[in-house]
């Protein structure tokens, strides 16, 4: 099991909740994102401690290969980690945007597109997210809606609260609203087409670039299915909230020790702690000849190798809430 150093990103819309959530110190202002686990070129995660401390995620995959990723994932992705895990803190509204699917991204010279999901960690009063359209939009009206700033009028805005889950397939127009603090799970891609940005200016006084034409090509104009994922929380039992070709995600509320069996799972597992603290226990596997134990707390993200047969999750006195995600 590994933890990685967070890659903190300052943004014009960023806030001040990420560092307290993770229990870390930073001199940075307006931290909008923490990249928790990343194989994106130029922003590759680095192991925080343990025998491989200082090793990049790419080097770790070069060393252990399928023992970490799983046989199927290693054949498909090699040393390119297939998921990007983030925390996002929005002090202001993020831009209205869309991501391409794999086919379009590859036409643009990128490895893949971006399907993603959000888990709401915290939400200020009145916080909202936009996910898809309220009703189908005529593509012929798209550029007019962007030019007049009326694009927001056709979006499906949802009031949010902690624990809400939203799935965002490639091609769905979306936006994170002011006051939202989310954990994001996505394909490894930084392909984002900005549609509308409230005429905000960067540090040099320039409005940020829009990608109106590319976005039009990427958008599914008939996508009106952006409501929150419906699920019933259950104690000590994983609850599935997302399953797609790119990732499967479960939520867990752990009040008593839980044993997760990964014998039939040909994939790494990522654990994201959203509340509480506890201990993860993993038996000996192809990566570690001895059992390993790791203390975890709110804001931690842990990578568990595919060669692990299972994971024992022991909650602290106040319990533990976590996200479990993998490819498969």
Residue ranges of each PLM-predicted region?
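Acidic/His-leaning functional-site neighborhoods
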Residues: 232-283, 291-300, 308-309
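Short, structured patches in soluble enzyme cores that scaffold and shape functional sites
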Residues: 98-100, 121-124, 133-135, 146, ...
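His/acidic/aromatic-lined binding-pocket segments of jelly-roll/cupin-type domains
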Residues: 85-86, 94, 116-119, 157-158, ...
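Transition-metal
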Residues: 1-137, 197-227, 249
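Short beta-strand/loop turn elements enriched in aromatics
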Residues: 120-142, 238-241, 256-269
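Double-stranded beta-helix
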Residues: 130-153, 183-225, 317-319, 323-328
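Ligand-binding loop in jelly-roll beta-barrel domains
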Residues: 78-80, 88-93, 102, 123-126, ...
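Short acidic-glycine-tyrosine-enriched beta hairpin
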Residues: 154-167, 181, 283-286, 291-308
